[in-house]
Regions:
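Secreted peptidase-domain scaffold signal
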Residues: 162, 304, 313-336, 354-358
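Subtilisin-like peptidase catalytic core
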Residues: 2-124, 137, 147, 182-185, ...
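Extracellular/periplasmic catalytic domains that process cell-envelope and extracellular macromolecules
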Residues: 30, 57-61, 89-92, 149-153, ...
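Secretory-pathway/luminal and periplasmic proteins that interact with or process carbohydrate-rich
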Residues: 47, 75, 165-166, 285-293
C-alpha cells in the first residue's frame, strides 16, 4: 500500500508520535554519520584527507548531501523518527536514501518487520512493535510519483545488511524493493561481522580490524575531532578516522548509485527503479571463487580470534562486488568483459546481438595480421 505524506503525518499526529525534523547545534556524537558521508562525498584531488566515490572536485561537480539525523546521539530511533526522515527527504529533493542502519532483532520476514507481534527468537518470547510508519514512509520515498531526478522513475534506497554475522539481511534492508549491502575486507573475503544470505543484494568494501598496529585494513574516511568515538585517526588527527562495517560498505554503493544517476542524465537516459537497480546488481565482480577454506577473524565483540568457514558465504553475499566502471558502461549500453592480460578468450557474440538483425564487421589489415 502506498501512502501520501499527509496520511503518514496524520498517523504520527493521531498516535502522539509526531517528530518534526529540525536543525539543531548538536555534534555527531559517534562520528558514524560523518564517516559515512565522507565515503560518498569528500572532495577529491584537493590534497586533503581522503577521496570519495562521488565527491567531485569542489567545483559544484559532486554529489550533494542532505542530512536527516534520526539517532540524536543514541544507537536507536523510533518508528516515527525514521518515517519523518523519509518524508522530509522525499519532499525536499533527495533521490537516494543512504541508510547505514538496521534492526538488530532476528527479523526474518517482511510481516515481522512491518506489523510486529509476538515471536520466539533464539528460544525466547519476544514482542516486536513493528515499523508500519517507517515502511509506509519508505514506500512513499520510493513511489515514482515522488521521484526527484529526471533520469529516474522512483528514488533509490540503499541499506547496510547488518553487522551481526547473521545468515540474513537486517531490516529494512531485507525488503525486496531496496538494496541491502554486505561487506568484504581488503582480502576480498567477507568481513567476519557481515550479515549474509536472504535479502542481501550486493557487496562492497567494509574494511576489517586486524590488530591495533594495523588499522589500515579498515576504511579511512572523515571524522569528528571531538566525537565520543574509539576509532583511531592518523597520527592523532581524528578528523580522518578508521572504521569497519556494513555501514561503511553501504555508502560505497550509494556513491556508485549517485555516479550512475549523474551519468544517465548526461546521456539523456531515463530508467525505472527496477531497471536501474538491475543494471547495478549485474555490474559486479565475482566473489564466490574466493570463498574457500577458512579465514582468521578478530571478533571485536568478544575480543578474541575465531575461524570463519568461508564456504557458508558462497552465493550469499549478493550478486557480487560493486563495480562503478561496469555500472557506468551498463548505463551507457556497452557490454564489459573481463579477461586476463596475455590470455586468449572466445566470445559468443550472439549474446549481444539480435538474431534477426544483420551486422557488418570491418577488420583492418593490421588487426588481421595480429589475429593471424
Amino acid at each position: 500500500t502506498l501512502y501520501s505524506s499527509a496520511q503518514i503525518n496524520g498517523v504520527l499526529k493521531e498516535t502522539g508520535q509526531e517528530k518534526r525534523l529540525q536543525i539543531v547545534p548538536e555534534t555527531d556524537l559517534s562520528g558514524h554519520g560523518t564517516h559515512v558521508a565522507g565515503i560518498i562525498g569528500a572532495t577529491n584531488n584537493n590534497g586533503k584527507g581522503v577521496s570519495s566515490i562521488a565527491g567531485g572536485t569542489g567545483n559544484n561537480d559532486g554529489v550533494r548531501l542532505m542530512t536527516c539525523q534520526i539517532f540524536e546521539g543514541s544507537m536507536s530511533a523510533s518508528d516515527s523518527q525514521n518515517a519523518a526522515a523519509y518524508i522530509y527527504a522525499a519532499d525536499n529533493g533527495a533521490c537516494i536514501a543512504q541508510c547505514s542502519y538496521g534492526n538488530s532483532y532476528a527479523i526474518t520476514e517482511d510481516d515481522m518487520y512491518i506489523n510486529g507481534g509476538e515471536f520466539k527468537i533464539d528460544g525466547k518470547d519476544v514482542k516486536l512493535d513493528g515499523s508500519p510508519l517507517e515502511n509506509a514512509a519508505l514506500r512513499y520515498f520510493l513511489d515514482p510519483a515522488n521521484s526527484n531526478h529526471p533520469s529516474l522513475e522512483g528514488n533509490i534506497a540503499v541499506f547496510a545488511a547488518g553487522n551481526h554475522s547473521q545468515p540474513y539481511s537486517s531490516y529494512p534492508g531485507a525488503l525486496p524493493y531496496v538494496i541491502s549491502v554486505t561487506a568484504f575486507g581488503a582480502d576480498y573475503l567477507p568481513g567476519g561481522y557481515t550479515n549474509y544470505g536472504p535479502g542481501c543484494k550486493i557487496a562492497a568494501p567494509g574494511g576489517e580490524y586486524f590488530d591495533a598496529d594495523n588499522y589500515g585494513m579498515m576504511i579511512l574516511s572523515t571524522g569528528v575531532s571531538n566525537a565520543a568515538q574509539s576509532s583511531p585517526g592518523i597520527g592523532g588527527d581524528r578528523n580522518y578516522v578508521y572504521m569497519q562495517g556494513t555501514s561503511m560498505a553501504c555508502p560505497h554503493v550509494s556513491g556508485v548509485v549517485a555516479l550512475g544517476i549523474s551519468y544517465a542524465k548526461k546521456l539523456g537516459k531515463k530508467f525505472s527503479r527496477d531497471e536501474f537497480q538491475s543494471l547495478l546488481l549485474t555490474s559486479v565482480n565475482e566473489l564466490d571463487g574466493h570463498f574457500t577454506g577458512t579465514k582468521d577473524y578478530y571478533d571485536l565483540s568478544s575480543y578474541s580470534w575465531t575461524k570463519l568457514d568461508l564456504s557458508r558465504y558462497q552465493g550469499k553475499m549478493g550478486t557480487g562486488a560493486v563495480d562503478a566502471w561496469k555500472f557506468l558502461m551498463a548505463i551507457e549500453g556497452t557490454p564489459t568483459i573481463m579477461t586476463q592480460a596475455g590470455k586468449k578468450m572466445c566470445i559468443d557474440i550472439s549474446r549481444y546481438c539480435n538474431p534477426h538483425d544483420e551486422y557488418t564487421i570491418t577488420v583492418d589489415a593490421a588487426t588481421k595480421t595480429a589475429l593471424g
